[in-house]
């Protein structure tokens, strides 16, 4: 899987808000949010890392906002959001 948000946000026919992949929250200039140099060296040297270090670049946060009917719990409205980092809207 890619950790990249998909653009298929919608409400399904029975009222469920849906998006295939919300995306990764964190620094996209990284290895799934971890320091890329450490992760690459671990892969190349086949070393078991005792500790992972988070990437310290600008983070991206992405997700969806769902408005639901209080009585049924069904989705009335759904919209994507992306803030910060390299995937800015």
Give each language-model segment a name:
Residues 2-54:
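Conserved beta-sheet core of the metallophosphoesterase superfamily
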Residues 1-2, 82:
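Residues that line or immediately flank small-molecule/substrate-binding pockets and catalytic motifs
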Residues 38-89:
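A short C-terminal boundary segment appended to hydrolase-like catalytic domains
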């Amino acid at each position: 899987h890619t950790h990249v948000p998909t653009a298929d946000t919608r409400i399904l026919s029975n009222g469920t808000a849906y998006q295939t992949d919300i995306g990764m929250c964190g620094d996209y200039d990284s290895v799934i949010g971890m320091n890329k140099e450490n992760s690459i060296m671990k892969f190349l040297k086949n070393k078991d890392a005792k500790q992972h270090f988070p990437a310290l670049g600008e983070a991206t946060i992405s997700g969806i906002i769902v408005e639901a009917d209080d009585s049924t719990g069904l989705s009335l409205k759904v919209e994507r959001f992306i803030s910060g980092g390299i995937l800015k809207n």
